[in-house]
Amino acid sequence: MIETPPLVDQYCHGVLRTELGLGTFEAQLMRSAGPPAAGTTFFDTQTGFAVRRWCPPLLGLEPHATPARYLARRRELGAAETARLLLRGSGVAAYLVDTGVPGDLTGPKELALAGDAEAFESVRLELLAEQVADTSGTVGAFLANLAEAVHHAATGAVAFTCATAFTRGDTPAVDPEPPGPGAVRGAAGRWLARRPRGGAVRDPVLLAHLLWSAVASGRPLQLHTDEADPAALTGFVRATAGFGTRLVLLGGYPHHRRTAQLAAAFPHVYADTGAALGRTGARAAAVLAELLETAPFGKVLFSSGGRQLPELHAVGALVFREALGRVLGGWAAEGSWSWRDAERVAALVAAGNARRVYRLDRDETPP
């Protein structure tokens, strides 16, 4: 039996405050372009089965309760109490919360209160630029205000996050090298001239400027890869070597082995277990084992990737803990590892690596 400390969930979002019907709840279970096909349900997925396995006991039901029974119990308890029970039952001691997604979601303080945990903010660079653009009348004011906003955010947040630079097929490739002042001014002028209020930043020059502004801050930079091949990051990874800023690659499944290879090849790169474990459910141990084939154990960080449904935070944590126990416990049981080493590595991946990388403990020194 592998004992792990309380987890640090190094990437997640807030949860919805409202009651959810069957259709709304089901829509949050999967990343999908639309509702389930006629005659099917998103509950018949690895994520759906994982929710039914792990969440009902936290709400006082038997494992594998039917969706109807589970949602009825959810309504009996109410959204706030459901979130409280699920978050507190997940064994998470600290959350790093990306506050840059739309919707009526709880912020870090509310998530901390509901989960009886610490919570820290990860600032999304795109949202920061969009907020500054909404209040800046000229290109010069925008760039000056953006620099000040990044500096101010770095004093309170534990990390920056970029969600679009390396993930979107409709976004041109971002040059890995920092853009010059003239290129940045030109890109800012074009963007400000044509964007509506609240318009998203997609310009590759501005995205590169945001990335390099974050690198200069010294805060860890979380980079989404989603389902894209992390190989697209290689140029930026090479260019940022030696700056002292840690890059944490989020997502990557089904290319998680490539993420692990980048973490092994570059001292400043770290690999995230991510929402893939919750999405793969009963196969999570196999996915985690593949990540641990190549990545140095001090470079792997747990996250749930939970968003909107507290069930996804809970499932991410509980599936991870079980998968970690199965993988490391299996290697120890067969004699490949000692039990002491297995528990030491479990503690690193579960919490220790994140606490070191993000300097969550005041006495931590930079990695």
Predicted regions and their residues:
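Mid-to-C-terminal alpha-helical segments outside catalytic/metal-binding sites
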Residues: 1-10, 16-61, 68-73, 297-299, ...
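Divalent metal-coordination and catalytic microenvironments
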Residues: 11, 95, 160, 271, ...
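Active-site metal-binding loops of divalent metal-dependent hydrolases
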Residues: 12, 100, 225, 305-306
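Alpha-helical scaffold segments that flank or form the walls of functional sites
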Residues: 24-115, 121, 143-155
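Short, basic, glycine/proline-bearing loop/turn elements
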Residues: 67-70, 129-136, 269-277
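Active-site gating/metal-coordination segments in enzymes
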Residues: 86-220
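Catalytic pocket-lining loop regions of alpha/beta-barrel enzymes
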Residues: 193-303, 353
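Short active-site-adjacent structural elements
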Residues: 309-313
